[in-house]
Structure formats: structure tokens, C-alpha cells
Amino acid sequence: SWSVGAQDKTKWTFKLRPGVKFHDGSAFNADAVVWNVQKVLDKDALHFDASQVGVTASRMPTLRSARKIDELTVELTSSEPDAFLPLNLTNLFMASPAHWKAKFDAAAGATPADKSKAAWTAFAADASGSGPFKMARFLPRERLELVANKTYWDPKRTTKLDRVVMIPMPEANARTAALLSGQVDWIEAPSPDVIPQITQRGFKIYSNAQPHVWPWQLSFVEGSPWLDKRVRHAANLCVDREGMKTLLGGMMAVPKGTVPPGHPWWGNPKFDIKYDVKAAQALMMQAGFSAAKPMKAKAQISASGPGPMQPLPMNEFVPQSLKSCFIDVASDVLE
């Protein structure tokens, strides 16, 4: 359970579940929680790991410290009241301090910092958490094998599967072929044009619209054309989102913003995101661009990943749309 201070809303008290063990058999307790907070916030801690900060601390920016009250009680301090903190703490990814210490003791390195970095590298290949599955084998970019954690704290939720094998397949057609050939039992984000074939073969498609908008992160460095609000508005007006929905076989919802209209955070925006090429062209000409003098931009895009569903087709579609509004985008595909 958890509670926030009656007087000080930056103080959070968490009561930990008794009897929970990490996969290596060590206890999940207050010391472990404090240790895991330190790994991303305390640069002086031996086990501080800068490589984890981006995927942990950046997602809970208000977290400032952790303090042990007793064996199963922890007090967290945030920089300000933050209703999302309990949810965002799932991004901390609790690791076993004892398992890491064993990796540290066995690691080679000229300095403690070198040994710490080596220990985290070894930990990543042989991790120890507290979930219903344990890591059995890990081959980077090839496969991850998980086995059931028979000592999971909740017997009612102990997995019925003995083993799960996860195989990275960046290309949607390769994933689909693996499913249809029986190589795998489940895939994420198949090619939209093969969904009828998949369903005809007796497979079930599970889909659901979710509030997950995948934006382009624009450069606001000095001299960037994106600093001009007219250019940003033009780009938004130039993307045919209904056309993208068709491209994806209907497997998307057309967004009006980061949150949908009617959401408590919607506010009263003055700019209406819609598809209006003529209005976009007018804004671009006001900003000094034209068909004869297009704006040049470069976009780094991912070749894979479930976040943007179909990153290559989607990120090919956007530059095609923008071209009609005097924006020429060169794509740099990153693995």
C-alpha cells in the first residue's frame, strides 16, 4: 500500500509486501528499494548506472530520494506533488542488489567505476528481478528465454507457461511469415495488408485504440526552421492522418493532439490540427518557403519498434505528405 503525507504532499510512504523474493532468493525489502532509487539518482553510489537514467529517472522526473523507515517501509520524496509518481515508479525496474553485488565482485576493472559498469553489463545478460518469469538465456538481438518463477509471491498468478521465448523481428513481413509457418505462436504489429490472411488461417487479432501518440521530436536549436510556429503549424496541417489510417488498414485512431478532445487536459487550443494543404502552403510561404525554395529537414527514424507500430511505412508516408507543403525531409534510418 502507499499513502501521501497529510501535510507534505511531497512525502510518500510505501508499505512493501512481505515475503517477496528476487529470483536469486534475496529479499525484496526497503533496502532494495532505496538501492534501486540510488542507482539512477545518486551519482556517488557505487552502483550508479548512467545508462539506466534515460529509461528510468527521465520518466519520473519529480523523484528526489528514498529513505528506509523499517524493513518493509520506504519513504520517497518528490520535488513537488505528483499524482503520477506511483504509476511512474514502474519504470524504476527493481533489480536485485545481492545479484548485482555478486556480479560486481566477479567483475574485472581497474577502478570501482569500471567494475560497476562491467557488473551492470553482466547483470543485463543474467538479470534478477521479482516477476513471474525468470531469465534463462539471453542472446542480444537474437532471443530472450524466460522460465516460470515457481516461487512467485502470488500462487494464484503463477504462470501456467513453463517457458517463453522472445525473438526480435524488426520487419513486419518476417514476423507474419514466422507466425504463419508455425515458428512462433504470437506476434505484435503484423503488416496491415496480411491481416485478412492471418484471420483466415484461424488466428485471432487483438487490437484496441490507446492514447499513445507517436510524435516527431523537432529540433529547436538556434537556426532551426522549426522554431517558426508557422512552419510547425503547416507541417501539422499537411499530414493526411486519415490516409495514414488507410495505410495501416484502419489499425489506428486519428489524433487531434497529445490527448483527445474532452480530456481534462484538453484545454482550449487555438490551433486546430486537421488536414488542409492549402492553409499549410500559405503558412509556409509566409515563412519564406515555396515549391522553388523548399525547407530542408533531416529525420532520424527507427527501423523497428512497437511504439510507432509500422515505423518504416509510417515514416515514409509523413515526408510524402510534407513534400506537398514545401518541406523536403531526408530520412536517416537507425537500427
Where are these regions (language model features)?
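Append "and occasionally in soluble cytosolic enzymes with long acidic Gly/Pro-rich linkers
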Residues: 145-150, 199, 227-325, 330
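Aromatic- and charge-enriched surface segment that lines or borders ligand/interaction sites
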Residues: 2-47, 75-77, 178, 225-227
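Short, well-ordered beta-strand elements
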Residues: 11-14, 33-36, 74-76, 131-134, ...
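Ligand-binding "clamshell"
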Residues: 195-207
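Periplasmic binding protein-like
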Residues: 25, 186-189, 201, 320-335
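Ligand-site clamp/hinge motif
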Residues: 17, 121, 151-197, 328-330
